């Protein structure tokens, strides 16, 4: 049983990644993101997921530094934005993110979106950074199967992680199976469906276990082998989201949640975005 917040999965290169972390999408730079990260670290989180596009890497880095937690105990993820695809641009973007975070390295660096015709050259830069030991693991975000095939057919380094929109209404079963087949860890962004949790099936399971629908969804992630990074700016909610290690969903619970899949996206389709 997955029993504590510091439990990890082992990525395809041997690096250990916490099964749960804090996401900071749409968390404002400055006091808000610093307070959010500080609350999470105080609550026992050791994984923080940011991105260049979020505009809050500086605040994340400041909160990490002020926490006093040894760097070796933390797992920090950031992502390369779409404007910085290409070999040289990606190298510069990586350096810029490190400078903002105030870190010597990140644990996981992701290509945020698969910009058509550009992501392969970017992956070449990622491989360079990885081989030089400047990143502990490299991965992608929002990659469909055909995007992953492009990378797998072109390069020796298999992405360690694919971070995708994934939740009970968008379970991504085919993509998850492909990732499992190739040793790519799936990570869920927007695991709580941007607040669309008012579903009778979730309410029933939550009542059964004395938990909230959000906690049920996060437990479903964990028991499905999915790394999850719920976002919140409220300390009470950050603590509540982490309170999912004292119960277990049974087979009927898991089946009921799996049956909610409708292929419903709340975010952009990686094959059809214009940013």
Regions found by a protein language model. Give the residues of each.
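N-terminal binding-site loop/beta-alpha segment at the start of enzyme catalytic domains
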Residues: 1-74, 273
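Alpha-helical scaffolding within the catalytic cores
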Residues: 2-9, 58, 62-65, 94-96, ...
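Glycine/small-residue-rich loop that forms an oxyanion/phosphate-binding "nest" at active or ligand-binding sites
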Residues: 79, 83-123
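Short, acidic/polar
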Residues: 28-41, 86-101, 148-149, 170-171
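A structural motif
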Residues: 45, 103-106, 135, 159
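Beta/alpha (TIM)-barrel catalytic core signal, keyed to glycine-rich beta->alpha loops juxtaposed to Asp/Glu
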Residues: 29, 114-267, 271-275
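Alpha-helix N-cap/helix-start motif at helix boundaries, enriched for small hydrophobics
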Residues: 22, 48-50, 106, 138, ...
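Acidic (Asp/Glu)-rich catalytic clusters
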Residues: 12, 61-73, 95-104, 128-130, ...
């Amino acid at each position: 049983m997955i029993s504590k917040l510091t439990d990890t999965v082992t990525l395809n290169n041997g690096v250990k990644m916490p099964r749960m972390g804090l996401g900071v999408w749409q968390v404002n730079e400055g006091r808000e993101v610093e307070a959010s990260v500080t609350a999470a670290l105080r609550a026992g989180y050791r994984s923080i997921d940011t991105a260049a596009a979020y505009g809050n890497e500086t605040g994340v880095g400041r909160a990490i530094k002020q926490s006093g937690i040894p760097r070796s105990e933390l797992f920090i993820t950031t992502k390369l934005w779409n404007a910085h695809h290409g070999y040289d641009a990606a190298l510069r973007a990586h350096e810029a993110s490190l400078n903002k975070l105030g870190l010597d390295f990140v644990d996981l660096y992701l290509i945020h979106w698969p910009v058509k015709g550009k992501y392969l050259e970017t992956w070449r830069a990622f491989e360079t950074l990885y081989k030089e030991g400047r990143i502990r693991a490299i991965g992608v975000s929002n990659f469909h199967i055909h995007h992953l095939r492009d990378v797998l057919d072109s390069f020796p380094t298999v992405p360690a992680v694919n971070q995708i929109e994934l939740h009970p209404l968008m379970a991504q079963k085919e993509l998850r199976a492909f990732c499992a087949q190739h040793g790519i860890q799936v990570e869920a962004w927007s695991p709580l469906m941007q607040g669309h949790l008012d579903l009778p099936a979730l309410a029933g399971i939550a009542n059964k276990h004395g938990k909230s629908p959000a906690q049920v969804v996060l437990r479903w992630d964990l028991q499905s082998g999915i790394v999850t990074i719920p976002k919140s700016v409220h300390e009470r909610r950050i603590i509540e989201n982490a309170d999912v290690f004292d119960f277990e969903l049974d087979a009927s619970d898991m089946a009921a949640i799996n049956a909610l899949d409708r292929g419903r996206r709340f975010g952009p389709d990686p094959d059809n975005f214009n940013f």
